[in-house]
A protein has these predicted regions:
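Phosphate-binding/catalytic loop of phosphoryl-transfer enzymes
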Residues: 81-180, 184, 321, 325-338
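ATP-binding/phosphotransfer module of carbohydrate and carboxylate kinases, centering on a glycine-rich
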Residues: 1-66, 70-71, 95, 115-121, ...
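Solvent-exposed beta-strand sheet faces enriched in polar/charged residues
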Residues: 77, 106, 259-263
Length: 338
């Protein structure tokens, strides 16, 4: 028996949000768990995470144990789903599980785009653990990037920012590079005294190198008063501009009024110099562009894409934005306290 209108999944490299909503936009449940990127866990491993969260969501909504179909539409927008073959593999696996009558699978950047605009088209750039960009034209054409990291020319995720900060701190300490406040701020974050001590800790495994991703907010903060940190942030701005510019060019939108939405942990709340640099850089190629952070979470976009498939009207979409936005804010507060 169908129990919900939409099963929506925002599966990222650090966390997964799962929502159940009705066709009228009413939110039945929103739960959060660990990462579910197929790139890191494989398809079965990623869907095992989703399945566990789905059971939790069904219990929260008092909709039973999850046996059989749970929704009309399932929209799974997941990090690490970058090629059609990967989309197909996840879609087939979800269909085999029988969660929904209709299954849509795509990269999580599409969720950011849908969350940020009512137009249904535009460009979105996400910067979380990595960096990615998608574009959708008013005619339905897509512009995408493989987004596999350095092997596909990418730079600008939170990990890249953090690693650049660690490198700059080390070079400041030994004199190969300019002096920077990162020399003190970076090791202090890890409760060590010097960049050399930090390097030894990473080398010996006492400090997990993946934790450098946690330094992204520190880099943005230091950039206000430190030239080296500001240069790292300017590099990020140039990469965001390059991705969005190429997407706009492919879709022939450089002369059109068009929105570029920014999302992901690094860009979600971007303002000040970074936003200004992205805006001014893009306007050189697309003078009518509007650049802004998306106001809604990616899980909202995933759920809205499901409502789109159900042909839900504006009242249902507005209700979804309102209720799921409030539920997400509560989830974030609990996560922060925890």
């Amino acid at each position: 028996m169908t129990r919900a209108g939409v099963l929506a999944v925002d599966g990222g490299n650090s966390k997964t949000d799962v929502a159940l909503v009705n066709a009228d936009g009413a939110v039945l449940a929103l739960v959060r768990g660990a990462l579910s990127s197929p790139q890191h866990l494989g398809v079965d491993g990623a869907l095992a995470v989703v399945e566990g969260l789905l059971g939790e969501a069904l219990r929260e909504a008092q909709l039973g144990d999850g046996a059989g179909r749970v929704a009309h539409v399932a929209t799974l927008l997941m990090a690490g789903v970058d090629f059609p073959a990967e989309e197909d593999a996840v879609r087939v696996a979800v269909e085999q599980r029988g969660w929904a009558q209709s299954v849509h699978v795509g990269n999580d950047t599409f969720a950011v785009l849908r969350a940020g605009t009512e137009l249904g088209w535009g460009v979105a750039v996400t910067c979380g653990a990595g960096i990615n960009c998608v574009g959708v034209g008013p005619d339905g054409r897509h512009a995408r990037f493989p987004a596999l990291g350095a092997i596909t020319g990418d730079w600008g995720g939170g990990y890249d920012l953090g690693l650049a900060a660690v490198s700059a701190a080390a070079r400041s300490e030994d004199g190969r590079g300019p002096r920077t406040t990162l020399e003190r701020a970076v090791p202090a974050y890890f409760d060590v005294t010097t960049p050399s001590e930090l390097a030894e800790g990473i080398h010996t495994g006492r400090i997990d190198q993946r934790r450098v991703i946690e330094l992204a907010p520190l880099v943005l903060a230091e950039a206000a008063d430190d030239a080296v940190a500001a240069e790292i942030v300017q590099h990020l701005a140039s990469e965001v501009v390059a991705l969005a510019r190429v997407a706009l060019t492919r879709l022939e939108l450089t002369q059109e009024p068009v929105e570029v939405l920014l999302g992901g942990g690094v860009l979600q709340d971007v303002d000040g110099d970074l936003l200004a640099a992205i805006d001014s850089g893009l306007r050189k190629a697309a003078p009518n562009v509007t650049v802004r952070p998306t106001a809604s979470a990616a899980i909202v976009g995933a759920a809205l894409l499901g409502l789109d498939e159900l042909e839900a009207g504006p009242e249902a979409q507005a209700r979804l934005r309102r209720e799921l936005g409030a539920a997400f804010s509560q989830l974030e507060r609990v996560a922060t306290v925890g």
